[in-house]
């Protein structure tokens, strides 16, 4: 039995082949769906794998970006790998110094703060002419605040191993980004003028953020040193150490500069200098951290990046709210790039309407 026939135009039609071709459409659709499921699953697993290390990965990229000019100069003299190793070792030395300072200075303070909060729980509020229900509600709020404070202190104590792991990942990626700087630069090199302008906006914002970050953190350290001297927390060497710690902590995702003035204020209150402790807390909150991060920083970044300071503030607050400390950098960059993309889209629309 023949399985084909000849059409009038001379083309042979194979019945079996036609049946397979008819099945080919649905078969290809199923195959495409399965392929996309596999791709999405792999991407989701990759994101889940990288997500715990996203913060050190992100800050490693920022550090490598900031060290890039120095890396280029060193590369000309000692080579790319040697330059990357030297800079990574320098960062490792800084990380070890910070770890030692944390162990020998903050650990006793955290322990004392925990004991102080525990003692506060035993205090009973007794205010004349105030209903017991109000006092009971107030005690409940205070107890909740104390429990959260104790939980935060415990989390700081157990954060040292996490800090070490993040430092290892951070330094590894810094070295990788420095060694592979040529490949990374080629990866974000485009010929399309629109993409080039968008990348330049992101680059300009990132440069502004890094410059302002460095400048502001140095000023924070100076102000913290002055604060420790003004409120008589310590002598000059310890005050200078507090300033250096403020600068260093401002670069660490896990910590921040406010921890230094908080420790100083707690020390003053424990010594009985309550007014001085409150004064240092107000001074630190207003001039060191976190208020300057959301007032002075947006204005400086906006001026450097030629961007609206209100949008920078929105980017910083929204980024921090959604992404933590790294959102201070990601938020303004995303907004600036998004606005540049909107401008390019409007230009394309205008050209289309004219044509």
Swiss-Prot record:
Keywords of the record: Cell membrane, Membrane, Transmembrane, Transmembrane helix, Transport
Chief localisation class: membrane
Lipid bilayer topology: Multi-pass membrane protein
UniProt superkingdom: Archaea
Transmembrane feature ranges: 34-54, 55-75, 84-104, 158-178, 212-232, 240-260, 274-294, 310-330
Pfam families in alphabetical order: AI-2E_transport
Localisation per UniProt entry: Cell membrane
Any GO CC annotation of this UniProt entry: plasma membrane
InterPro entries reported in the protein's UniProt record: AI-2E-like
Record-stated family: Belongs to the autoinducer-2 exporter (AI-2E) (TC 2.A.86) family.
Protein name: Putative transport protein PH1000
